[in-house]
Amino acid sequence: MQKMMKALMAGGEYKPRPGYQPTEREERDRRALLGSNIFYNPTLELVEIPVPEPKDDEILLKVGGAAVCGSDTNFLGADKDNYSRYAGHCKLPCVIGHEFSGEIAAVGKNVKELKVGDLVVAETMAWCGECLACRRGQFNQCENLEEIGFSQNGAYAEYLVAKEKLCFKVDGLVDVYGSKKRALEVAAMIEPMAVAYNGVFTRGGGIEPGGHVVVFGCGPIGLSAISLLKTSGAAKIIAFDPNKTRQALAREVGATDTFDPFEYWQRGEKLSDLVMKVTKGVGAAMVVEATHKPAENIPEAVDMLASFGTIAQIGITANTVELHPVYMQKKGANYHFAIGSSGHGTWPNVIRLIEAGRVDPGKYLSKCYHLEDSIEAIQAAAKAEGGKFVVTPNW
């Protein structure tokens, strides 16, 4: 008799929004490049499904922790037209949860480096390795991309499968955090830190030590960016977020100054003027945009940039942004866009930083939830009631 498990499943009817023409891949695979364009009457419910069996090149992971991402909150409810609010790649139905850790419970016959009992994390972006983008090393732009927790069953479940090539060992975190349980809870937060690393360093090029930086948004990715930029030698780290709890977390991980942007906007004041005052006229060597509302932030970001400064766009939105290129050109500025976290040694680098105590995502792990309470965890994240929330399906 096949073993069953509990899982949080997102569903929806494949019904392209009126006026939207699906691509060939969307029609063929019944997937969506933007879920909000295709999936109608979305659902999110705890179900029972069979425990998956690993293929020859896969591992079966007993999930230790599944961290709640802002993307997951978009699977709650629907928009005014009863379409999914998730503006990203997905194929429904699918078990969501893409930030995770666990202990290997079984391995496929062709798995070479990993074994049962290893503690691992895995990249979300399940790249093919064969398309032109992958052959260039551009794994986050894979033309045949699958994504764990969006188009392949994810981690709000007792078990999941992942290809060995996507996995990295984190056994060393047990020594850092004192127990396997705590190590796996914190390890589930490696993915958002890897996303921040990709945006700040791989795509954004980093900063010279002594440069000032600004971070819009003190959610988990913004907090990760602050942690990484402090480690890399930023002087002033100025963080904007209306949430007082998240402002406090930002200061704990390295922000030197935190502000509620709406307090200034409501008074008709520009954030760029504030940044220039705090930096004594120098401006920001880098501005990290880590919200879902760049339309409000980017015009300010352009004005607060120092000469040859960089905007690192990590937050994702389907909305348009007004940008006047001439202002960027006069400053010799750069605007880099980032998505995902695969390749370039990003995950091993992040793991080593945590093992060395240079960054600690555990500082903003606010609460753990049982799998049965996973929707409650996602709702808490939607309300920004803390830093990071982690679902622990097996304890």
Task: Name each model-derived stretch.
Residues 178-179, 209, 215-218, 230-298:
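Adenosine-nucleotide cofactor-binding segment
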Residues 251, 260-262, 266, 294-356, ...:
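Glycine-rich phosphate-binding loop and adjacent beta-alpha segment
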